[in-house]
Amino acid sequence: IRDRFRADGEKVFKERNTFLALEGNFGRLFAGTHDTAFKVAQLKVDLFNDTRADIKYLFQGENRMNSFVAYTTPELIDGLKVTINSISQSTGTFESYSVNYSTGSIKLAFALDSNGKGYDSTRFTTMFPIESLGIDVGLMYQSSEKISTGVSENGHLLSLKKKVSDKGSVYLQTASSDIKLESGKQNSIGYDYKISKIAKVFFHYSDLESDKTSKNAEYVSVGFEYK
């Protein structure tokens, strides 16, 4: 369980995945409550996950589902794995697929959601370092079609993270998407200071803007995270 406390005193409670798994040379079969293959294909490019700057406010597909059955292949070639999800829901079967490739410090993912909470979505993600600058880069592009209307929208994200000391890191993130908010844009900056391997303090600032002015907001978070 992860606990977060924001500066306004509100506690944000987040459950972890809860599932049973069978794993061997054949791959990994698991069932229960789990992040979808589509969500996992985000590759943690969202540096503000589980905060008010989470990309779920702009992008469809950040889902953790119940009634979940999934299979991940063993490595088909070095660094390449495929994950298949089947989730039962009231509107029919929700299927989620991903292809993930990792080599050294470079990661790539391609994912599809079919009938995922009323959307069909495609996502491309990559993470890689710029070693000469000491910066980790995250990039994501997504297209989502609302099944009931046939309207398709897209969005993209760029995140940058750099260590500024042995224990401190600064990070920036910018995202633009029409999927959940028309002309939605979110810019965020954060700083983490590690107290230990399992604890850190953090500061976040985020600005969300869109054509729907009632959703526009600025957020400041100061907190402590223990894993």
Predicted regions span which residues?
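Residues that define the transmembrane beta-barrel architecture of outer-membrane proteins
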Residues: 13-16, 63-67, 76, 91-95, ...
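Short loop/turn motifs that connect adjacent beta-strands in outer-membrane beta-barrel proteins
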Residues: 26, 76-79, 130-134, 166-167, ...
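Detector for outer-membrane/organellar transmembrane beta-barrel domains
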Residues: 94-188, 193-194
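Outer-membrane beta-barrel pore domains and translocons
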Residues: 1-2, 34-36, 85-89, 111-115, ...
